[in-house]
């Protein structure tokens, strides 16, 4: 064999081994999280920058519409998990924690845990908060000319049949019950939400739908309904997309925080690459990027958010945010749901 041929074969062999080594080293992280707008914005703001900074790690996004379905997937895959990281509501994260489906996220998993706001670390939950959102009142500014000031404006006669609220078991309906319960003098929502249920009973005759589809924002933008309730983050993005037709306000009675947690799946296939993604997702850089992209309030206290973005979150209105222990509330959620079925739904028919 000629020397040149030997050299060519040697180079080819070395190249092949190098390629095999690169393939062997590449890791995949599967992130299970919300579909739709969340997926679109989170991919651009967090996942793509993470992959750029970590060229040896590929992130695959597995979208699902809600946290309950995510928990169902985790349960079904317990023996052989397919996901490494899950972003879901805190109450569902608690259920996954109790079922030992998760690894606790502490400073050993991510150094950024130390910089999270105190309410981002939830007792007896393995995940930590990755976003804060809050309930807002929505309205179609082409029809409703004056910005509403109270949640009870939804009960005004001129809105008969024009209100859309994602009702219970959706957490948005439950949140509105809690807000109005406090506004009307209810002391402990874990003992009674009678005042909140009564308030929703007054709004109910105006409600066109408790199940706006595909979600509440386009229903109000289209004029099918003209007022309602929804989450601030999606409301802000839809307000921009509608050219300002959809508007969102924080009524005088206040709001509550909804907490999305990021969770580390036990025995996930991506191993330590999952922890690396979680660390990045909790970093000031990622928190800033997603807040400025979709207007979720950040959970990392060191995130330097622009004034324009912060103004579109509840961060500057914390005095209006009612504290809720979602974990304790989960224990009384079914009795509240039963009151909703008996005392609210019939009044909207």
What does each model-identified segment do?
Residues 33-43, 67, 82-83, 87-224:
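Extracytoplasmic ligand-binding site segments that recognize negatively charged/polar headgroups
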Residues 133, 197-203, 242-266, 301-302:
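Periplasmic-binding protein-like
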Residues 137-143, 181-183, 258-271, 289-292:
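A bilobed periplasmic-binding-protein/Venus flytrap-type ligand-binding module shared by bacterial periplasmic
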Residues 265-324:
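Mature extracytoplasmic/periplasmic domains
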